[in-house]
Structure formats: structure tokens, C-alpha cells
């Protein structure tokens, strides 16, 4: 039709949010660190079910502690994920480049490569990529304010076995995890 303007490709509307999750449990695990009350919390969470695979509270957020939890998760659940997704924190990702401009490889990345696990990272300043972790830490911190004496292990048990999730069709992470093995 003549006289009408053409749409400008550069001015497209905001992209619609799309929820993603792998169709089976143990394909991708998310991991991250968060500080709360001068302690560092590290968690590995299954992408499909949102089940906490391993958790720990430490004095410092280190690669060694993250690897300890990864091995703990694999041994306790007798499974090795295909992919690990994390942010670009120094515990996981080599943020330095050598003199030739090549990105270094972190101890965490080397260990995953040795185990045959792919390592994916979120974009910088884009917490939505690892949103399941961000949401989990938010839930933990809110609950800890109400349940002061609850240990991390008690919280994880409640989260995995009792707390239903809207995104999981009102099932618990444990139920969804068992369905999708």
C-alpha cells in the first residue's frame, strides 16, 4: 500500500521472554556463589527439576570449594551432567588473557574438560541467563529471615521435597527430578 511507512528493523520491540529448560534431568546444572551474613553459599542446581544437587557454606568463595561440591553432587547422585552453567566469577572462569591475547583457562574449566563436561557461562551483567540460581538464592535469603535457626541442609530438604513450584506445574523439584531421569 503506497503512502505507508516501512517498519524500521533497528527499532524492533522488546523481545518476548522465553523460559528455557532442558527436557531431562541431569543434562545441565547451574552453579553460583552468593554471600549472606558474611558466609559464602555455593549451590549446584539441576536445570530441569530445580533440585539442589549439592550445597555448601564456606568462609571463602573458591574454586577448590566449588569443585568439592561438584564432586560431592556427582558422587551423591551417581551422575555426571553434560553441561555446567555459571557466571563469569573468578572461581569458575579465567578472566585474564596472556601476552598473545589468548584467554586463559581456569582450574574449574580444566577440571570440567577432564570430566568431559561442557562449560557454559552467562553474559556479563545479564543475571537472567543464570536466573534459576538467582531465584534460588533470593528464596533462600527470604526464608532465612523468617526461619533464623534453620540450617542450609534443612532449607534444601524443604526446597527439594516440600516446596511446590509454579514453573514445575505445582510439583516439588524432587518429584520432577524423578520423573525425568
Could you say what each language-model-derived stretch is?
Residues 138-181:
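C-terminal domain-tail junction helix/linker
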Residues 26-53, 60-64:
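An active-site-proximal beta-strand-loop segment
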Residues 86-88, 98-141, 175-178:
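RNase H-like two-metal-ion nuclease catalytic core shared by retroviral integrases
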Residues 37, 55-83:
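Active-site beta-loop-alpha junctions of metal-dependent nucleic acid enzymes
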Residues 90-93:
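Short, active-site-adjacent cap segments at secondary-structure transitions
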